[in-house]
Amino acid sequence: MVSSDYFSTGDGHQLYWERHGTPGGEPIFFLHGGPGGCSDRRHLEFFDGRCFDIILFDQRGCGRSVPHGELQYNDTGRCVEDIEALRQHLGFGTISMLGVSWGSWLAIQYQQRYPEAVLKTTLVSVFVPFAANVSAYDQTLNGGLSATAHGAYAVSAGAIYQILNNGCATQQRQAALHWLRATLQLSGQSMQPSALEEFVDDEALRAIRLELHYHVNQYFFTTADEAPSLDAQTEVIQGISDTFGMASVRWLRRRQPLRCRLLNAGHNAFELAILKTVRQSLKREHLR
C-alpha cells in the first residue's frame, strides 16, 4: 500500500481510501458493489499494480468509512460526487474506473456528470436500477424471503427494512438472519447456522440496513437516468447466468451500441472467467 487516509465529504461522512500500485501509473478508481459493500485487498487481484495507480475507497456508510451504516446524506448522487471530490483531492486530471455490480452504476453516473474527467471505464457484472429491473429483483427477493420464512413474519424487503429501523434488538437480529438466509439461497451459497449466527453483529446489521435503504428508494433512480450515454472507451464484462446483469446489459444496448464481452459465468466478479477477463481487458486497454 502506498498510502491511506480519510476524506471528509463536508456533510458528516468520512470516506476511507487506500492507494496501491504505482504512483504515476494510470490512475484507476475501483467502485465496489453493494450498496453497503466495501473495498477489500482482494479487489487488487483485478489489476496489474505495475501499470496502475489504484484507488480503493469505501462508499458512504460502508466498510471503514464513518459513521458506518449512516443513512443521512446517503444516496446515489452524493456517492457520485464523492468520486469527483476524491479525484480532485488526490490531484488526478483524468481517471479510469472499474465498477463492479452496484459500482458499475456509479461509474455510469459519474461518466454522465464528468465525461471530461474519464479516461476509460470498465463495467463488470452490471446492475442498472431501472424500474422493471428493480421490480423483478424485489419480487425475487420477496420470494426468497417467503421460501425461507420458517414462521418469520417479515416476508418482504420493505418489512425487513422497517424492522431494522424500528424493531428491538432481538427483532433486528432475527430480521437480519432471515435476510441473509434468503439472499444466500438465491445466490446459490450457504453458511453453517453457527457461522451465520456469528456473522450477524452490529456491523452486519448496519450494512444490511444501508443496502435496503437504497433498495426501498429504488436506488434513487430518476427520469434523468433513463438515457445514459457511454463513451467509446467503455467496456462491459458480463456473465450470462446473471439474470439482472443481463437485463441491465439489454437495457443499455437498447440505448446505444455497447462494447460487451459475455462470459459463461454468473454475477460474482471473482469467478475465474470474469477475473481473468477483467485483468486481460485492463492490461490491453492500458497498452493502447
Q: Which residues does each predicted region cover?
A:
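Conserved acidic catalytic loop of the alpha/beta-hydrolase fold
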Residues: G77-I95
